[in-house]
Structures are given as C-alpha cells and as structure tokens.
UniProtKB/Swiss-Prot annotation:
Pfam families: TIP49, TIP49_C. Belongs to the RuvB family. Signal peptide: none annotated. DNA helicase which participates in several chromatin remodeling complexes, including the SWR1 and the INO80 complexes. The SWR1 complex mediates the ATP-dependent exchange of histone H2A for the H2A variant HZT1 leading to transcriptional regulation of selected genes by chromatin remodeling. The INO80 complex remodels chromatin by shifting nucleosomes and is involved in DNA repair. Also involved in pre-rRNA processing. It comes from Gibberella zeae (strain ATCC MYA-4620 / CBS 123657 / FGSC 9075 / NRRL 31084 / PH-1). It is an enzyme of class 3 (hydrolase). GO terms for biological process: chromatin organization; DNA repair. Its main location: nucleus. ATP binds at G71, G72, P73, G74, T75, G76, K77, T78. May form heterododecamers with RVB2. Component of the SWR1 chromatin remodeling complex, the INO80 chromatin remodeling complex, and of the R2TP complex. Keywords: Activator, ATP-binding, Chromatin regulator, DNA damage, DNA repair, Helicase, Hydrolase, Nucleotide-binding, Nucleus, Transcription, Transcription regulation. It catalyses: ATP + H2O = ADP + phosphate + H(+). This is RuvB-like helicase 1.
C-alpha cells in the first residue's frame, strides 16, 4: 500500500494567556478612557495616565524617567504595561522582565540590569544602497588566459545587458559576480538585481514578456522594473544597543584551532565590559551626529519591583541619569514593607524613598462588582467558553468575595465539567462543583489552621 500522510501547516496555535484580550489602552481621540474598550474595563484614571506616558514616549520626551504602577494583586498593573507596549507598536523597543530575573550565579545583577537597559534602547540605522535592476538582455563572459598556465581559460570579466522601463545599460562586472549569477541560474529574459556595494545578485523571476512562450511552466513571471536601471534605495534597519554589544563582544570567525574549539564549546554567559559599551556609545554618537542613525528610547518594564534589592535601586538611580537611558516602568503590589537587602528599613512599595521620589506613580484601584462581571464576559469570549447569565453572576460573586484571578481560573475547568455533564453551556451547578474541587487561598489557609491541617509538616 502506498503511504500517504497529511502535511500539517507550521502555523502556531496561539495559547490563550492571562492578558490575551488586551489590545490597547482603549482611549478616545481626546485622551479620555472609555468604560470598556480594547479589552480593558474600568481603571479609567490609570489608563488616561498611561496614555499621557505613551504620548511622551512617542515624542521622545520621557527618556531617563520612571513610572511606578502601584496597586493590589489583580488590579491590572501588568495589563496596563502590556497595553502600553501594544499602543507603542513594534518600532519602539519594549523589554519586559521580572524583579527576580536579574539574580544569576554567572553574572552580576547590575550587569543584568544594564543588559536589559540596553535591550530597551533601539537604534534606527539608515543605509543607502546602489542597485542595478532590470531584465537581462545579454550575458557574455569574457575569457582570458589562465595566469597559472595550462590550457584552461579563466573568466576575466562579465558583460551583462540590463533593460528597465526607462532605459538600458551595459555593465562590465567582476568575475566573482559571475559565480553568483551561475548559482541563481540566470538566463537571458530573467529579471535580476545586483547590489553595487556587496556584489550580491538575486534573481527576481522571469520577465512577463516571455509568459506565452510555454503552456506548462513552474516559473514566476514579473513585470520589467520601473524607472532607471541604476537606482539608489534607502534601507532602514532597527537594532538594539544590546545587539551591538553582543556582536562586538563575541567576534565570529578565526581559522586557528582555538577559535574552532571556542565555537564548539558551550557558550558561557559572559559580562560585557564598560569599556566596550563606552566604545559602542562613541560609534553610535558619531552615527547620530552624521545623521546616519537615530536613537529610539524604548521601555524597560520591571514587574514585581519589590524583589529588587537596595544595590539594584542604587544602580538604577545612576543608570536613569545616564545620557542614553530608556523609560523605566516598575510594577509593585506591596504596601509598606522592608526593602530587600536591608535588615529593618521599611519603605512604601518596598522601594527606597530617594528612588521613589524620581517616579511618576500611577495607582490602580480594586474592581467593582459590575466591572468584574464585564471582565468575566470578555474572558469567556476570549477562551471560547459559553456561560449562562446565572453562572456569570455566581463567578462574579467569587471575584468580589475572593479574588479576580480565582474567579477567572474557574472558567475553563467549569467548561470541562459542563461537557462531562452533557451541557454546552456552563451552569451554576458547574461553578459550584468547581468551587468544591479547587480551593482558594483563604479556604486553604483556614484548612491548615484547623484540625485537618495537623497532617502537614510545620
């Protein structure tokens, strides 16, 4: 029997994450927040504040400043940061990290902070390329005697004729380009382009003038290029300063045995020196002065900022004042607590008062019952779950009484229980059954403090 198998596409299935439904800040054109828009519900004042921050970032007037999103758990701090990144788009770098991410056995925490700082600073490099583009009308290699002797001949130059909509040119090319043309299997009638700086050659397709030549042909026909044969194209590349650091700290290549062994061995996480960063900053400054490059300060988002210790905050104090610094957005759900790395210094949000004085603080407030109901509806639509009105009321009650996270986590298990009971829609009894199966934090704590908690190790 002939084996036939179905080829599955390489399209990724998007996982429904906690903030998949957030598409932006949901602001009107005048900057005021709508009650419900772009997946956001409530938090009008916080969203409007973030809208002002986004405008400042776009105008590049916010670099080297800090914003703190402060509020209790489940009030939408991470969602606000994600919405800021959605509003800024892909052109402005957005680097999200968690406060505990910077602690490593291999690299200093200050080095990790600086690495993420430079990830959040983009560089827009403009490069002008000279390109010859057109339909090949002539392809003649010119041979010469082999300088090494013998009867063989070598290609000395290559004559190529290119035709575009506005004119025709005959070029004499280097023999190295002939190899590239052979690799691309270029023949007369093909449309190609050649980069003058690098000598790179690319076959675009067959000229559409030859489209009726054959009935059956797996050829892509393209029109003759418009304009002149010789063109100047401006190409814009977006890189981050960290990309430049890494490229210069680990130079590739080298034919000696040590270089070969170094490439085979497992790459160790190494620190990038301040001297190297200083040199890169000089080159970047030179490019900016020449008008070749443009600096794009992005956003560094540090979630759970209370996990940073006093040394990190001291380092951030200095880093924020440097001439090349991104916008730093912190998020913390702590009230008055001890600063990490100190014995008894208590401060608001677990952040030292001198650093807190540099921050613009955006507070988030707990959601009301009506807002929680709306969020449950949005999440049920996002997760593709059908819920009855009575069940939504029941789930929203849990959101008010227990926590928003707990009530949203009940949606998917409740849909599985509903299917097991032969229903397509989640009902109140499915939510009640889910509540019995899965404890919330307060019920679990009450269980441990009661007689039933004696079996646990203290």
């Amino acid at each position: 029997m002939v084996q036939i198998s179905e080829v599955k596409g390489n399209k990724r299935d998007n996982r429904t994450a906690a903030h998949t439904h957030i598409k932006g800040l949901g602001l009107k054109s005048d900057g005021y927040a709508e009650k419900q828009a772009a997946g956001f519900v409530g938090q009008a004042a916080a969203r409007e504040s973030c809208g002002v921050v986004v405008d400042l970032i776009r105008a590049q007037k916010m670099a080297g400043r800090g914003v703190l999103l402060a509020g209790g758990p489940g009030t939408g701090k991470t969602a606000l940061a994600l919405a800021i990144s959605q509003e800024l788009g892909t052109k402005i770098p957005f680097c999200p990290i968690v406060g505990s991410e910077i602690y490593s056995a291999e690299v200093k925490k200050t080095e990790m902070l600086m690495e993420n700082f430079r990830r959040a600073i983009g560089l827009k490099v403009r490069e002008t390329k000279e390109v010859y583009e057109g339909e090949v009308t002539e392809l003649t290699p010119e041979e010469a005697e082999n300088p090494l002797g013998g009867y063989g001949k070598t290609i000395s130059t290559l004559l190529i004729g290119l035709k575009s909509a506005k004119g025709q040119k005959k070029l004499r090319l280097d023999p190295s380009i002939y190899e590239a043309i052979q690799k691309e299997r270029v023949t007369v009638g093909d449309v190609i382009y050649i980069e003058a700086n690098t000598g790179a050659c690319k076959r675009v397709g067959r000229s559409d003038a030859y489209a009726t030549e054959f009935d059956l042909e797996a050829e892509e026909y393209v029109p003759i290029p418009k304009g002149e044969v010789h063109k100047k194209k401006e190409i814009v590349q977006d890189v981050s300063l960290h990309d430049l650091d890494v490229a210069n700290s680990r130079p590739q290549g080298g034919q000696d045995i040590m270089s070969m062994m170094g490439q085979l061995m497992k790459p160790k996480m190494t620190e990038i020196t301040d001297k190297l960063r200083g040199e890169i900053n000089k080159v970047v400054s030179k490019y900016i002065d020449q008008g070749v490059a443009e600096l794009v300060p992005g956003v560094l988002f540090i979630d759970e900022a209370h996990m940073l210790d006093v040394e990190c905050f001291t380092y951030l104090n200095r880093a924020l004042e440097s001439p090349i610094a991104p916008i730093v957005v912190l998020a913390s759900n702590r009230g008055m607590c001890t600063i990490r790395g100190t014995d008894d210094i208590v401060a608001a949000h677990g952040i030292p008062s001198d650093f807190l004085a540099r921050m613009l603080i955006i507070p988030t407030t707990p959601y009301e019952a009506d807002e929680i109901k709306r969020i449950v509806r949005i999440r049920s639509t996002t997760e593709g779950v059908s819920v009855s009105d009575a069940a939504i009321d029941k789930i929203s009650e849990h959101g008010v009484r227990i926590s928003l996270r707990y009530c949203l986590q009940l949606l998917t298990p409740a849909s599985i229980l509903a299917k097991a009971n032969g229903r397509s829609q989640i009902d109140v009894q499915d939510v009640a059954e889910c509540e019995d199966l899965f404890l919330d934090a307060s019920r679990s704590a009450a269980l441990l403090s009661s007689e039933a908690g004696r079996g646990y190790l203290a």
